[in-house]
Amino acid sequence: MIPKYGCLLVGLLTVCGAAAQHPDDEYYPYAARQEERTPLLLTDSTLFYRAVQTTPDLYAEHTAFNLPYVSVKRRGLNYRDESASVGVVRLSSRYFGAMRLLGADEVRYGGLAAADGVTGGVGGLRLFRFTADYPQASRYTAVSFTDRSYLAGARLSVTEPLGCGWSGTAALDARTGRDMHVEGVFTNALTASLRAAKRFGDDHNLSLMLIVPPSVRGTRLSSAEEAFRLTGDRLYNPAWGFQHGKVRNSRVRREFVPLAVVSYRMPVSQSTSLAADFSAEYGTRKYSALGWYDARTPMPDNYRYLPSYADDRETELAWLANDPRYTQVDWDEL
């Protein structure tokens, strides 16, 4: 009887593992998806026994190191809760700007919704559509300035008839510069897009679209409350430091993920039509991070380097003075 109740107790205290947090969309510049939840202590006592080490127990839920989740969890609905598509092809937010420059109409539906054979998420549904009408020749240029993620941007779009029933649109979207609030955060991105469309007869339409969005972004990291308090900066970023007098970020995201879409529309009868969409997306995503072996961690906000660890007054004064040798990555010493 005792072994039976012992097994029952173990079963009740053991739960199946499930991911409670999901990284934000890849376009979100502040996500730090490379960090992982790392428990400081694994117990093997009878009361807090964990039969499978990958599942949480009662003790770990109250004592484990959960700080990385601060950087990968946004408030409100997750970006992935909203679906976006052109036709039946799912779209990432990295292509939204290119779709608008190419002349697509944008329609949004709130909450759970379905339209044109596409089902949205709890965050709503965003649809991009191209009209079947023959487009008129047009030009569009714009210059923008901002203080978050990048400093300046420029957009250009040209639509021209190509003859033989073809029309073409070419667009460029460039963004560059540093964040004016968070040191180390910057963006250098260029999105080039092309679309060619041809109309056969009255209602047959063929379109070819290519979007190439290379980008390099410097991101930020979360930190401990003590680091924010000592520096007096609620946007403190421990990921950067000075190297030969210039700012260098250790967390840089490089992306090159082109998208190609081929669409065909044709009528079958007065009340029926046929639509076919083919897409291909292939590329690389790279995310840099500091690594070390048989050496001290170079991260400046590690708990061993904070004044509270050794009750060091000199270190506290250096942090209060925002000395970059203490508060930032010391590249010159690596």
State what each model feature region is:
Residues 146-177, 181-220, 252, 260-269:
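Transmembrane beta-barrel wall of Gram-negative outer-membrane proteins
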Residues 49-87:
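Extracytoplasmic beta-strand/coil segments of soluble accessory domains associated
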Residues 77, 112, 142-146, 173-175, ...:
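Outer-membrane beta-barrel pore domains and translocons
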Residues 73, 83-85, 106, 138-140, ...:
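Residue-level detector of the transmembrane beta-barrel scaffold of outer-membrane proteins
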Residues 43, 69, 151-153, 189-191, ...:
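Transmembrane beta-barrel architecture of outer-membrane proteins
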Residues 64-66, 118, 146-150, 184-188, ...:
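Short sequence motifs at beta-strands and strand-loop junctions characteristic
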Residues 89, 97-144, 151-153:
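A beta-strand signature from Gram-negative outer-membrane beta-barrel systems
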Residues 197, 205-263, 288-334:
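Acidic/polar loop-and-plug regions of large Gram-negative outer-membrane beta-barrel proteins
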